[in-house]
Amino acid sequence: MPLLHSKPTLGYLLEGEGRRIAYLTDTVGLPPDTLNWLLREPLDVLVLDCSMPPQPQVPRNHNDLNLALQCIDELQPTSAVLTHVGHTLDAWLIEHREELPGNVSIGFDGCEL
């Protein structure tokens, strides 16, 4: 699925064993066609790019937490995993992790879905 980035990037939808997992990295928001295509059936897991804490302006190439949570709200997955986490988001989460919705977690090396 096409994503929004300064270079062509694609997301992936994995379907099998009764589960739907979307893997969407290197994007800032979602193109309308991609969003609509993903909305055709519920997602079990959404793995989504989120590189920065909330920003005062719209970021370029990668989601900040505001945009990531907006995508999660639109897609309504059972669970969401934020990935492509930058140092500034990691530092922000030390003091604000409780501000994440209950179905949102932070990905890490070795994370299993």
Feature roles, as predicted:
Residues 1-33, 109-113:
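Core dinuclear metal-dependent hydrolase active-site scaffold
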Residues 29-112:
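Cap/insert and terminal regions of metallo-dependent hydrolase folds
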